[in-house]
Amino acid sequence: SFLERREHSFRKLTKALNEHDMGTSLSLRKGAEVYYFPGIGDAKQIRELTIEGTDILLLEMPFAQWTDEIYVDVKKLIEKQKLTILLAHVERYDSFQKSRKIWNQIFKLPLYAQINTGGIDKHKKKRFIKKFLKLQVPLVLGSDCHNMKTRLPNLKQGRDSLRDIFGETLLATIDKTEERLLK
């Protein structure tokens, strides 16, 4: 199962970090980026996919126009399942939302949004972030790092770009949001 594979990978990672004397300096938690599926709001075992030690579900939304059904499911995750929803890489969904009705409804729910730091200095992403900030949804940052060859960690560069473009205040707000989420 996914949970068994994740546990195996986590043990391998922990062992490698300890072999390089890096294990004590990092605080690692198991988690999953969970792709939305119809009925997720009623899924009984969804809590097993939250970030370890929290009620946070990192939810990847459909790359399509969002519908009433999607809204109802997200609302159920929050209200019925009592989960804290963190929508993964929100900048990727924008272009699919020809109608903003459900987009706006979802972002009025008590949830958090994650933006990936790659390409923050590009015009299109800057424009998206400026527009998204008006929704006043609490933000956190992600690196979208999947490996050390083609999808490298880029949080430092992204943070520097955010600071240069939007100022220190936004970065401080994001840092406080991240601390509050993971405490």
Positions of predicted regions on the chain:
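Divalent-metal (often Zn2+) His-rich catalytic cores of metallo-beta-lactamase-fold enzymes
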Residues: 1-7, 132-133, 138
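Mid-to-C-terminal alpha-helical segments outside catalytic/metal-binding sites
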Residues: 155-183
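Active-site-adjacent betaalpha module
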Residues: 90, 100, 118, 152, ...
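A C-terminal functional module that forms or caps the active site or interfaces directly
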Residues: 101, 112-114, 120, 124-128
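Extended substrate/RNA-proximal surfaces in nucleic-acid metabolism proteins
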Residues: 2-114
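Short secondary-structure boundary segments
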Residues: 115-118, 143-145
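Short acidic/histidine-rich active-site segments
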Residues: 137-153
